[in-house]
Design a protein with these regions (language model features):
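Nucleic-acid substrate recognition interfaces
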Residues: 1-387
């Protein structure tokens, strides 16, 4: 089984400068390749393959104007050109939107490393082209330190290593193949109802609270709002005509705001991962969830912020990944399946059930929490389709 591993890097100032140079060269090569494809299409020419574009780019590298590209590893620009060609082809196949040019200000700095030439130890990683000579290549000072020791295995085959900068820290993500491990699963299954009041309610009566209602998150959200207001006032104060004069204090405040946003994101993602791991580690035979219409829920201005903070897409994505790792069958119920309106005792559908009705009351005498009943109905739905 192929697993993706992402680890934070701790580079020194010289290594940071080199990384930004690599990311800049990767962005330049991507934009150049995309511009060539667009120019060729407008002239009525056929699609240019990435192999042909790489040959053109090699000649460009050796010109006097772009001699600075010779200090960058060839594999960095080569993969960027390939990515641009893939994005361009995917648009015509109808798989994605038309590719955009990467902006220096708005795009995330990132670059590729050759999967054969990259080297890992328990504590460091060696990037291709970071050293000026073979002698310097052997020195530990030219290796970038990893924040988590022993997280990435050594002496294995690596796939698609990517280095990225999120505004605060540098990260490396790499795919590694692990042997498949078969888990002994239980005979019972679990139905999970996702919501806003509580993150998840399981059919075995286990409830996971909404982390956004905790004091820690509320305090960080308050600090975030204050910083946003302060930055907004600073912009208005330093406004000169139609442009803004960004002072050093504004830059400092924006960095603080970025740290708050990262902190909130990490808290929410960590809680989701812990919740999913706890559910999956029970080793049920199957897990059944509902196919939520998240885009439709986001159109409700009263619920959109709460829906966004819950991270339903991330929950489902991680659940799919962890279920496939453990060999658990994941069943997704139809979007129009009435899990909340269906009585778990008599099967009656209460069509006039409102979102404000937190307790389900049926004519048969059944009185139950609506989210808990939805999870029971999802488990029943999963039992029909479980293999």
């Amino acid at each position: 089984m192929v697993k993706a591993i992402k680890v934070m890097l701790i580079p020194n100032n010289v290594q940071k400068t080199k990384m930004f140079q690599y990311a800049g060269a990767s962005r330049f090569a991507y934009n150049w390749a995309l511009a060539r494809e667009i120019e060729n299409y407008e002239k009525g020419g056929k699609f240019i393959s990435d192999a042909e574009l790489r040959k053109e780019f090699t000649k460009l590298r050796h010109s006097d104007e772009y001699a600075w590209l010779l200090n960058i590893s060839n594999n960095v620009t080569k993969q960027a050109i390939k990515d641009a060609c893939t994005a361009y082809k995917n648009f015509f196949k109808g798989l994605q939107k038309f590719p955009r040019f990467k902006s220096k200000k708005r795009s995330m700095p990132k670059f590729y490393q050759d999967n054969v030439k990259i080297q890992f130890s328990n504590t460091h990683v060696k990037f291709e082209g970071f050293s000026s000579s073979r002698k310097a290549n052997k020195q530990k000072m030219n290796w970038v330190r990893l924040a988590e020791h022993g997280r990435i295995p050594t002496d294995v085959k690596y796939m698609n290593p990517r280095i990225s900068f999120d505004g605060l820290n540098w990260w490396i993500s790499v795919c590694v193949e692990f042997p498949d491990c078969k888990e002994t699963l239980n005979d019972d299954g679990v139905g999970i109802d996702l919501g806003i009041k509580d993150l998840a309610v399981c059919s075995d009566a286990v409830k996971y609270k909404n982390i956004n209602k905790s004091q820690k998150v509320k305090k960080l959200e308050k600090q975030k709002r204050r910083l946003q207001r302060s930055i907004s006032r600073s912009y208005e104060k330093n406004k000169k005509g139609e442009s803004y004069c960004k002072t050093n204090n504004v830059i400092k405040k924006e960095k603080l705001l970025l740290k708050r946003n990262h902190r909130l994101t990490n808290i929410r993602k960590n809680y989701l991962n812990q919740t999913i791991s706890e559910i999956v580690n029970r080793k049920p035979r199957f897990i059944c969830i509902e196919d939520l219409n998240v885009s439709g829920m986001m159109k409700n201005r009263h619920l959109s912020k709460a829906v966004q903070e819950q991270g339903f897409f991330w929950f489902r994505k991680q659940l799919e990944y962890k279920c496939s790792d453990k060999g658990i069958q994941l069943i997704v119920a139809d979007r129009f399946y009435p899990s909340s309106k269906l009585c778990s005792c008599c099967g009656n559908i209460k069509k006039d059930l409102k979102l404000s009705d937190r307790v389900y009351r049926c004519a048969c005498g059944n009185m139950i929490d609506r989210d808990f009943q939805a999870s029971i109905n999802l488990k029943t739905y999963g039992e029909k389709f479980a293999s």
